[in-house]
Amino acid sequence: MLTNNELMEQFYFPDEAPAIPEFLSNDTFQQLEQLMYQQEFSTSDSQSDGANSCSLEMYYDTPSVLELEHMLNAQEQQQHHLQANPLGKNQGRSPRYWNKQQRSKPYDKLSTSMSSSTSSASSSSSSSAGFGGEVLKKRRLAANARERRRMNSLNDAFDKLRDVVPSLGHDRRLSKYETLQMAQAYIGDLVTLLSRDY
């Protein structure tokens, strides 16, 4: 399982460019890239609006948008790499990638704080794993015993109710639902009987 730091490193600094999905063609990537450019121009035009510019900037700086831009950059790099040198590895990064890297710094700070808290929690949990396992086992056994007692007392109460409620035939045992329905009808009949004037 990857920690947050490893995930961020894998996301922002992959060992090699990710493979292009088979269902996406070059035209699709070009359309996505044009859409990204249009969004960048629309955000730069709307930055004069004051409050709207802040919300748009935060919207376009989300990790999903950055991931899409990274995928587009990786696809471009793969195309240039395959055209220029089909056997070597791609070592460079486009300038747009580094611009997006600087825009994503708030997420880096968030991920480092989250990863430090998860690493401290994992270290404390690994030290108390032996002791915690026994405690959890005892708690689980106690909870199972309580649930068994509760179900037994509930079944006993239904058995007593079946003995009191008149049923149509004694050839089969009434289900819990049928027992409750019969008890409701029986109580209703008793109430009407008691409310009569003699």
Swiss-Prot record:
GO function term, MF aspect, one: protein heterodimerization activity
Family annotation (InterPro entries): bHLH_dom, bHLH_transcription_factors, HLH_DNA-bd_sf
GO BP term, pick one: sensory organ precursor cell fate determination
Domain bHLH: 138-190
Domain of life: Eukaryota
Stored CDD domains: bHLH_TS_amos_like
Region of interest (Disordered), residue spans: 76-131
Subunit architecture: Efficient DNA binding requires dimerization with another bHLH protein. Interacts with Daughterless (da).
Protein name from the UniProt record: Basic helix-loop-helix transcription factor amos
Organism: Drosophila melanogaster
Taxonomic classification: Eukaryota, Metazoa, Ecdysozoa, Arthropoda, Hexapoda
